[in-house]
């Protein structure tokens, strides 16, 4: 497969993997590939007597390659035509096109990476900010692998203690095990799991961005705020109330924070059916948002619609903005004073940067999970362990507790893909490009 972009460039890389692939490429390469692993050879790709391209070829032998099998990478000139010509020759000689993510899938199946590392590769490719890239790289390096293995080891020690007592009760040198003796280690392990879950709850904000909804009654400056944040005229700005009848979206980057902005229709009572639908949609988006920006017009007294909106968003993660500060302020509601029309929003931007600063996690060896699949499995592991702990506290015999402990252990194994289902692998690797 072509592992680089199919665009004109200095170099294109064609990747081949599988037993015998080095000898296969040697059959139409003029250079010498009879060298040790991780070496580069110069020569020409030839089709019979015709020279097709001048290339450098990297070879990787043995099981210590990315895929866990022999690999070849042909570095040819980066023209689209010449790259396709070399690829076509490889196919004519007997190779087949790789499927999406097949190289990474082979790496997983051959034990070179586990499922969490495969997911991290996908995350690094799609990362849209530095913090997401750092987290993904840690995943590739085995950060998740290591702490999940530690949890598994702690859990299997507890299970082993129980199994030994069940299978060999007649041995006098084996101390009789009671639920009371199992409790301290089990409770400590549950705390480790719950701490990881607590640290992982905001990972989707780093990877996917912060869903940010701008709400307020009509003509308070919501669209002006969106345009000021986006630094472009994305929303229509007029003095006519109800101009924005549906949602308007855009994304902005504040350092390493990505805000997925949604400007909603002004919230008010209206007879206009189309505007009413927009208002209804605005209200539904409030509950789904990670951050709600409530915009008030500071140049006019607070009205019933403002109060209703403040009550509606109380308890949510919100920032109250007093807009039109350039016209003077006649309300005493607590909030950040801005002038969206004049682009005076620096205090708001700094507030968001401070609130969503994840550097303590991304710049450390903090134990965090990368996605919802992993979080759900660790939640299940913690829940099963908690059932076992409750049984211990109730004095239930240890041989009846071990089933829940095994359930917890199986969920930990699934995080690393040790018993991954085929459809899960298909779903993951089809997200990869063909050459990865």
Predicted regions mapped to residue ranges:
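A glycine-rich (often HGG/GG-containing) alpha/beta subdomain
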Residues: 1-134, 138, 142
């Amino acid at each position: 497969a072509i592992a680089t972009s199919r665009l004109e460039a200095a170099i294109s890389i064609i990747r081949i993997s599988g037993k015998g692939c080095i000898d296969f490429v040697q059959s139409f390469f003029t250079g010498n590939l009879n060298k040790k692993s991780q070496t580069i050879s110069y020569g020409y790709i030839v089709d019979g007597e015709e020279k097709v391209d001048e290339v450098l070829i990297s070879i990787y032998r043995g099981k210590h390659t990315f895929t866990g099998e022999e690999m070849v990478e042909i570095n040819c000139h980066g023209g689209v035509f010449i790259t396709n010509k070399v690829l076509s020759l490889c196919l004519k000689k007997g190779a087949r096109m790789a499927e999406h993510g097949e190289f990474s899938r082979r790496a997983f199946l051959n034990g070179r990476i586990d499922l969490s590392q495969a997911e991290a590769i996908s995350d690094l490719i799609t990362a849209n900010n530095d913090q997401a890239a750092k987290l993904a790289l840690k995943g590739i390096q085995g950060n998740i692998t290591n702490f999940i293995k530690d949890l598994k080891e702690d859990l299997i020690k507890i299970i082993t203690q129980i199994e030994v007592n069940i299978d060999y009760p007649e041995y006098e040198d084996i101390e009789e095990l009671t639920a009371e003796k199992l409790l301290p280690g089990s409770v400590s392990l549950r705390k480790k799991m719950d701490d990881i879950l607590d640290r992982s709850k905001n990972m989707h904000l780093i990877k996917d961005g912060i869903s940010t909804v701008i709400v307020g009654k009509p003509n308070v400056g919501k669209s002006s705020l969106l345009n000021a944040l986006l630094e472009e005229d994305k929303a229509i700005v007029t003095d006519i109330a109800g101009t924005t009848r549906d949602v308007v979206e855009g994304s902005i980057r504040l350092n390493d924070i990505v805000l997925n902005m949604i400007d909603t229709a002004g919230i008010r009572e209206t007879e206009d059916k189309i505007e009413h639908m927009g208002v209804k949609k605005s209200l539904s988006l409030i509950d789904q948002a990670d951050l709600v920006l409530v915009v008030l017009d500071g140049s006019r007294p607070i009205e019933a619609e403002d109060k209703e909106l403040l009550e509606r968003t109380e308890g949510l993660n919100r920032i109250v903005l007093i807009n039109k500060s350039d016209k003077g302020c006649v309300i005493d509601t607590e909030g950040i004073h801005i002038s969206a029309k004049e682009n005076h929003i620096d205090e708001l931007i700094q507030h968001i940067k401070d609130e969503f600063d994840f550097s303590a996690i991304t710049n450390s060896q903090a134990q965090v999970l990368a996605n919802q699949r992993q979080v759900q499995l660790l939640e299940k592991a913690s829940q099963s362990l908690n059932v076992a702990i409750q049984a211990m506290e109730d004095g239930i015999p240890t041989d009846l507790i071990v089933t829940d402990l095994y359930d917890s252990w199986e969920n930990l194994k699934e995080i690393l893909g040790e018993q991954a289902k085929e459809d899960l692998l298909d779903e993951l690797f089809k997200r990869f490009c063909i050459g990865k």
